[in-house]
């Protein structure tokens, strides 16, 4: 299950980093992951979390709505600036609505359940949760893989990509659709587990190069190994209550992110 979910996460992150040409790009930049989390939180708020498949369905629907709103706001120009600004706005809006739902939770138990779920974990998940999201995620993965060559061309710059026949507006729409399906599936199953997509590609790039298409499979395997090890650590750690996987990944990811920023600053100096 770790392998399956991590593959979803890594593919969408690599697509995002390739499209934005920013090695620090993260799913939160699009706002779709925040929308998926909002959908899952709403299912808990309305007491539907116990209904079979309700939580993943809410997350997938919210991710799809977020993707539609993102495409509407970004327009048809394919502009990276508009796309990024629309994603930041969408992420802020979904985050604010999630905080509002937590604030309006009918009982302290509902509020605690929402916060616990948002921390991300695999301990209480099953293959039933994965299977409901799997068909849509397969479509999302296929959309991303079909555009792998366009992402490689885009790494040479906008003008070079256009001269090679890349339709920027179409590429944007296809990637938003693929990323929305992968984000919705991963958040629906595991909650919010951050920094995996940020750390793993940087570990793999020195070994396989910088082409997005060459990074996809090695990053997925390396990411799965990282998540499995982190999940084992949080399960056996000698603490009073189990540390959530999302918390552990954030503890590992924040120093890694800082090291990347310092490295980039030295290179630019």
List PLM regions with ranges.
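Alpha-helical transmembrane segments in inner-membrane proteins
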Residues: 1-269
């Amino acid at each position: 299950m770790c392998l399956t979910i991590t593959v979803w996460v890594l593919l969408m992150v690599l697509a995002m980093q390739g499209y934005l040409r920013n090695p620090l790009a993260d799913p939160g930049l699009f706002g779709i992951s925040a929308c998926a989390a909002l959908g899952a939180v709403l299912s808990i708020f309305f007491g539907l979390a116990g209904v079979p498949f309700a939580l993943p369905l809410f997350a997938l629907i919210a991710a799809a709505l977020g993707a539609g709103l993102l495409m509407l706001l970004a327009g048809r120009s394919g502009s990276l600036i508009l796309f990024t600004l629309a994603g930041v706005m969408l992420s802020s809006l979904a985050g604010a609505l999630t905080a509002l739902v937590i604030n309006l939770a009918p009982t302290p138990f509902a509020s605690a359940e929402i916060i616990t779920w948002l921390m991300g974990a695999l301990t209480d998940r099953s293959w039933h949760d994965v299977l409901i999201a799997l068909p849509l995620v397969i479509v999302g993965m296929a959309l991303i893989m079909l555009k792998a060559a366009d992402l490689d061309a885009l790494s040479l710059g906008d003008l070079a990509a256009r001269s090679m026949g890349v339709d920027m507006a179409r590429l944007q729409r296809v990637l938003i659709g693929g990323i929305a399906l992968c984000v919705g599936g991963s958040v629906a199953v595991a909650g919010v587990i951050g920094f995996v997509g940020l750390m793993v590609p940087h570990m793999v790039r020195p070994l396989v190069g910088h082409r997005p298409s060459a990074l996809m499979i090695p990053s997925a395997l390396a990411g799965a190994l990282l998540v499995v090890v982190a999940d084992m650590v949080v399960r056996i750690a000698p603490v009073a209550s189990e540390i959530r996987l999302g918390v552990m990944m954030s503890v590992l990811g924040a120093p890694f992110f800082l090291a990347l920023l310092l490295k980039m600053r030295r290179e630019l100096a």
